[in-house]
Design a protein with these regions (language model features):
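HotDog/MaoC-like acyl-thioester-processing domains
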Residues: 84-86, 93-148
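Compact, glycine-rich, soluble single-domain proteins
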Residues: 34-42, 46-56, 70
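Hydrophobic beta-strand-centered segment that forms part of the acyl-chain substrate-binding groove
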Residues: 53-89, 119-126
């Protein structure tokens, strides 16, 4: 199963920063087992949402020629739980690159202004056409940004 963890892109500064939203619904299948009597969004899914948002930043900044693939999580801290019904505000910024072929991002997720995760991760850009249908990604981006 493929998880799409960004429900809306709210703002974009090409090559620099992106903000988005994840709405956590009770119907999310990962909540069935995490945990049945007290469902919370797994922290790794919050990290994945930040990583997916990084991909959208690189796609939009490269006219949908590139996509970010994470290779390493450098730092990650969690600060409380995310529950069904929460709206998670996601922010990702480009950090200083240690080399030409590596990118570093820092990201955070908040619910009602309270930080839930802070992370720094690195990876590489790949040609989008090698992993996704470019036109489909452009159409999906229009839906996420409500620009279509």
């Amino acid at each position: 199963m493929r998880y799409l963890l960004v429900d809306r892109i709210m703002a974009l500064e090409p090559g620099n920063k992106i903000t988005g939203v994840k709405n956590v619904a009770m119907s999310e299948d990962f909540l069935e087992f995490h945990f049945p009597k007290n469902p919370i969004m797994p922290g790794i899914m919050l990290l994945e949402a930040l990583i997916q948002l990084s991909g959208w930043l690189d796609a939009a900044s490269s006219d949908f020629r590139k996509w970010f693939l994470v290779s390493r999580v450098l730092k990650c801290s969690f600060y409380g739980f995310v529950f069904p019904g929460d709206q998670v505000e996601l922010t990702v910024s480009v950090g200083p690159a240690p080399s030409h072929d590596l990118k570093i991002y820092s990201g955070a997720a908040r619910v009602n202004g309270k930080r839930k995760i802070k992370a720094e991760f690195q990876g590489n850009l790949v040609d989008l056409e090698t992993i996704e249908e470019v036109e489909e990604q452009k159409r999906f981006f229009q839906i996420l940004t409500r620009s279509g």
